[in-house]
A protein has these predicted regions:
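Broad gene-expression machinery/nucleic-acid interaction feature
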Residues: 47, 163, 199
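Acyl-donor binding region in acyl/amide transferases
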Residues: 1, 194-200
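Conserved C-terminal portion of the radical SAM core fold
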Residues: 2-60, 76-102
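C-terminal accessory regions of radical SAM enzymes
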Residues: 69-182, 186
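A short, polar/charged loop-to-alpha-helix boundary motif
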Residues: 187-193
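Short, flexible, glycine/charge-rich loop motifs used to bind or transfer phosphoryl groups or to couple energy/partner
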Residues: 38, 156, 191
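Aromatic/acidic cage segments in peptide-binding pockets
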Residues: 56, 183, 196-197
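Short glycine/proline- and charge-enriched loop/turn segments
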Residues: 62-69
Length: 200
């Protein structure tokens, strides 16, 4: 949380990489960790990637795999975790990727599907649950009439900032554009109490 707080104070966008199926994890713990990521004010990233763990020959994890101390999730388990993650993602967060660019021929164990995101999106659609996550709502190549767009403002609080997510949406809740506004509620101590502003 400290690293996220630091870059937020200086106006940087937060883009978090979250790996599932690491050694010691299971589907339930991965879902719980993702919930913390998207609900704990110490985190609440603007954007994120969900990377399933997979095994390549050069990895030290190979020894654990051969010793039975780690196993890749089944496709059903992996898709279940990622579907739960997508459905829990708030409207100000975008999941940009779900796989890493590793050739299937280099993967000893784990997901080899290059279209994993499409598999997950189909499973999300099958739930009939509303999806708030940005990428799922982007207007993409669909047309939109300016007069049909409405501005919605979502306010939320992080550990160090007041956030405003402004989105221009269609009547179907598709996003035509958005803007992020961030106001620090706490400054680093040396900046707030000890530093003098530079001369202009």
């Amino acid at each position: 949380g400290d690293a996220v707080a630091l870059w937020r104070r200086f106006g940087f966008k937060s883009h978090v990489h979250f790996m599932v199926n690491l050694r010691g994890a299971d589907p339930a713990s991965d879902i719980a960790d993702d919930r913390r990521l998207v609900t704990d004010p110490a985190f609440l990233p603007d954007e994120g990637k969900r990377y399933p763990g997979c095994l390549v020959e050069s990895a030290r994890l190979t020894d654990c795999y051969e010793a039975g101390q780690w196993r890749p999730y089944t496709e059903e388990e992996l898709v279940g975790v990622l579907v739960a993650d997508v459905l829990a993602t708030p409207p100000w967060t975008r999941i940009s990727r779900m796989i890493r660019d590793i050739s299937a021929t280099d993967i000893l164990a784990g997901n080899k599907k290059t279209n994993l995101r499409q598999v997950v999106e189909a499973a999300v659609d099958a739930t009939d649950e509303a999806v708030a996550e940005i990428r799922s709502r982007e207007i993409s190549v669909e047309g939109a009439t300016v007069g049909d767009l409405s501005l919605q403002t979502i306010a939320y609080q992080t550990a160090t900032t007041e956030e405003r997510f402004l989105e221009w949406i269609t009547p179907e809740n598709k996003i035509s554009g958005f803007c992020r506004l961030s106001l620090p509620t706490a400054l680093p101590r040396d900046t707030a109490n000890e530093s003098s502003p530079p001369p202009i």
